[in-house]
């Protein structure tokens, strides 16, 4: 199979997953969006890092998705790379997702948006008891990407997820709080 056929197949598979997810997103937007992005991130990671996709594959897939789904937003090459980063950042901390476990073998996104959310729990993490799946799923993808890009540890990521939700921070406020290093200064305010 040549690269063009592979990309056409990839576009078809991702397009089907996107359309399924968009239908259900009306009732649970963040949950569905994060599930879809995590699944696409997994698929892209397996194929671009471990598979045989060449340079430019993500750009080609993004362009083809835009052609086949006019008006589609959020699937630029940069955003697809962010999805891959989202998956790669969280995959070590979250349990394996059984509904997409064969993703690297059969190159399909079997019900990406039907990921079992209860299986999204940290593995062997001292913060396991502090992990709140509702908080994780309650935060939008843009907020997650700000946290991923600007923090260094799971503990720090979880702190900013909880704070962003509790305080209803906009993405600008979240970025400012991270820049202010609120995580490392949180005890200082109480001690002053």
PLM segments and residue spans:
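Basic, low-complexity intrinsically disordered segments
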Residues: 1-192
């Amino acid at each position: 199979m040549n690269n063009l056929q592979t990309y056409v197949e990839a576009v078809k598979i991702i397009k089907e997953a996107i359309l399924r997810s968009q239908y259900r997103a009306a009732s649970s937007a963040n949950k569905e969006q994060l599930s879809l992005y995590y699944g696409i991130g997994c698929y892209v990671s397996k194929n671009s890092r471990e598979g045989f996709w060449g340079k430019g594959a993500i750009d080609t897939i993004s362009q083809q998705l835009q052609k086949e789904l006019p008006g589609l937003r959020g699937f630029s090459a940069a955003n697809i790379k962010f999805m891959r980063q989202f998956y790669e950042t969280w995959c070590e901390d979250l349990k394996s997702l059984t509904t997409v476990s064969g993703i690297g073998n059969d190159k399909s996104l079997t019900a990406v948006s039907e990921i079992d959310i209860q299986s999204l729990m940290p593995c062997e993490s001292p913060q396991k008891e502090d992990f709140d799946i509702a908080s994780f799923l309650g935060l939008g993808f843009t907020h997650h990407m700000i946290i991923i890009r600007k923090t260094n540890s799971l503990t720090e990521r979880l702190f900013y997820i909880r704070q962003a939700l509790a305080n209803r921070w906009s993405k600008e406020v979240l970025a400012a709080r991270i820049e202010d290093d609120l995580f490392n200064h949180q005890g200082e305010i109480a001690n002053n």
